[in-house]
């Protein structure tokens, strides 16, 4: 298997556990991975049931000193990270090195907004869940248990989408111009003479 310098995965529409298992395996193989738009990750099952599960997790704490953990992270990026950490032997040197190859973000911060993003088909909700099954968005769950930055991320994402659309429109116009210029050059008399001479 060839290792890319960095693979950027767009988390939107992926199931948390399935994506985590694929990413964990690649990290252990030496691949650097960045997961963006963690707030758009999905969990199967209705919102209320997943919220109850998270509240059950909130009750788990050290009896005599709560600061000793377990720590209940609310941000979508940290919830995904914790799910993935359980799939890696994170207390060994190999596991620690693997987790250092991972970055998880809400939204798509620079410089990853300019990088090519990929999806993982075996973790996509539309391919894995039966149509009509209920699912929860990680951002919604996080907000319901105390994550405060959903509005901030949404605002930044809206700005990014506008600039991305502008860039794409410019790129498409430029490609069209290049194609028409090439077509014109191919039809010119000089091009025909060169073609006759075998060039």
From Swiss-Prot:
GO terms for cellular component: cytosol; cytosolic large ribosomal subunit; nucleolus; ribosome. Component of the large ribosomal subunit (LSU). Mature yeast ribosomes consist of a small (40S) and a large (60S) subunit. The 40S small subunit contains 1 molecule of ribosomal RNA (18S rRNA) and 33 different proteins (encoded by 57 genes). The large 60S subunit contains 3 rRNA molecules (25S, 5.8S and 5S rRNA) and 46 different proteins (encoded by 81 genes). InterPro entries: Ribosomal_uL13, Ribosomal_uL13_CS, Ribosomal_uL13_euk/arc, Ribosomal_uL13_sf. PANTHER family: LARGE RIBOSOMAL SUBUNIT PROTEIN UL13, RIBOSOMAL PROTEIN L13. Its main location: cytoplasm. It is found in: Cytoplasm. GO terms for molecular function: mRNA binding; RNA binding; structural constituent of ribosome. GO terms for biological process: cytoplasmic translation; maturation of LSU-rRNA; negative regulation of translation. N-terminally acetylated by acetyltransferase NatA. The modification N-acetylserine is found at residue 2. The keyword S-adenosyl-L-methionine does not apply. Present with 43300 molecules/cell in log phase SD medium. Transmembrane segments: none annotated. Keywords: Acetylation, Cytoplasm, Isopeptide bond, Ribonucleoprotein, Ribosomal protein, Ubl conjugation. Component of the ribosome, a large ribonucleoprotein complex responsible for the synthesis of proteins in the cell. The small ribosomal subunit (SSU) binds messenger RNAs (mRNAs) and translates the encoded message by selecting cognate aminoacyl-transfer RNA (tRNA) molecules. The large subunit (LSU) contains the ribosomal catalytic site termed the peptidyl transferase center (PTC), which catalyzes the formation of peptide bonds, thereby polymerizing the amino acids delivered by tRNAs into a polypeptide chain. Pfam families: Ribosomal_L13. Belongs to the universal ribosomal protein uL13 family. There is a cross-link at residue 177 (Glycyl lysine isopeptide (Lys-Gly) (interchain with G-Cter in ubiquitin)). Signal peptide: none annotated. This is Large ribosomal subunit protein uL13A.
